[in-house]
Design a protein with these regions (language model features):
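Transmembrane alpha-helices and adjacent helix-loop boundaries
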Residues: 1-358
Length: 358
């Protein structure tokens, strides 16, 4: 039974690697404050750059969440885009209520609605929004996972079911009568906790909150990898039948990490929305969930750090390609997946580890 690569890297990582990680964290903590510098200052960064990096950090959290279920438990989910979007919609409901004040959100007025739907009750309160962000995706993952794992669904069938769930969610949210803005979704946010969303200081706070979530997700992942729980998850991935013969019930372990992964995605989605200023059903597109799997594969499954690198590499390249050669972006993404499958089965982290051993 193979030991989790994340645990191996953590135990054997030289001091210089840990120091490099600390330098990166400090640099990311300093980075948002460069947006406060005058535009003529060579160190100044634009609000666009700050938002772009904040988006990538949100995606990095999604990559960690997916790595927990795919890299450790061996469950390839193609539905994490749904949990990400649900967290974003929960935050969007709060932001829309803040923008509307005592009235109805703009899209409801446009559709001639006379009152808020029942499920919007309390959405003007930030504390309730936080509850929705955690509980709605968490409960959905818990219910779906309970029936899927009880039925012993795994492999490609599990992947297909998660993608079908995401696609169904996207179709549901596209409908105007569901009360979530239809095709346009939520936009036009003005304030958050009384602060202007577009203010640079608010952007900095959101960036730092995303960074804290990323660090906490990594810390939680590494902590799990070092415990008996992490070793059992790896056994679920490598030899589930043998684990069952040893007296363990894999369903509980898979259900816990599946639900935890969904909640992490939702928190990332909640921080994503106020930074980009919009949430719509396209975030639930099956291609987004497939793209997240590419981040993990490129960085290296079961490493936690690798998926963070993969998310950064792919989304950084995507930003450049969509500006320089937008018509070729999908070809580039497909090429990455093919090359990683053929030449980097253990991802970038596996390549670095192999080079260090030589």
């Amino acid at each position: 039974m193979n030991q989790p690569l994340a645990m191996t890297l953590t135990q054997k990582a030289p001091i210089i690697s840990r120091s490099l990680g600390a330098v990166v964290v400090v640099a990311l903590m300093i980075l948002p404050f460069l947006a406060l510098l005058p535009a003529e200052n060579p160190l100044a960064i634009s609000t666009y750059t700050l938002t772009l990096i904040g988006k990538i950090l949100c995606y990095a959290v999604v990559a960690i969440a997916l790595d927990l279920v795919w890299g450790y438990a061996g469950l390839l989910s193609l539905g994490h885009g749904l949990f990400f979007a649900l967290g974003g919609y929960a935050m969007g409901m709060y932001l829309m209520r803040q923008a509307a004040g005592d009235g109805l959100p703009a899209f409801m007025s446009f559709l001639s609605w006379s009152e808020l739907p029942w499920f919007w009750s309390g959405s003007q309160h930030f504390a309730w929004a936080l509850c929705l962000i955690v509980l709605v995706p968490g409960l959905l993952a818990l219910i779906f996972g309970y029936f899927a794992f009880r039925s012993k669904i795994k492999g490609v069938y599990f992947s297909i079911m998660t993608q079908a769930l995401t696609y169904a969610g996207m179709l549901l949210f596209f409908r105007n009568e569901t009360g979530f803005g239809g095709n346009n979704g939520f936009t036009g946010f003005t304030t958050m906790l009384g602060f202007p969303v577009s203010a640079t200081s608010t952007r900095i706070a959101l960036f730092l909150a995303t960074l804290v979530l990323l660090i906490a997700s990594l810390a939680l992942g590494f902590a799990l990898a070092r415990t008996k729980f992490g070793r059992v998850l790896t056994a679920v991935r490598d030899a589930e039948n043998r684990l069952t013969f040893c007296g363990y019930d894999p369903k509980g372990f898979k259900l816990f990490v599946w639900t935890l992964s969904a909640v992490l995605c939702a928190l990332a989605g909640a921080l994503y929305v106020p930074q980009v200023g919009i949430i719509n059903p396209s975030e639930m597109s099956p291609t987004n969930s497939i793209e997240a799997a590419i981040w993990v594969a490129l960085g290296g499954r079961g490493t936690l750090i690798g998926p963070v690198l993969g998310a950064g590499i792919v989304n950084g390249a995507k930003s450049w390609f969509t500006m320089a050669m937008p018509e070729y972006w999908q070809f580039f993404l497909g090429l990455i997946f093919i090359l990683v499958t053929l030449f980097l089965p253990k991802g970038v982290i596996g390549l670095l580890k192999r080079g260090r051993e030589k």
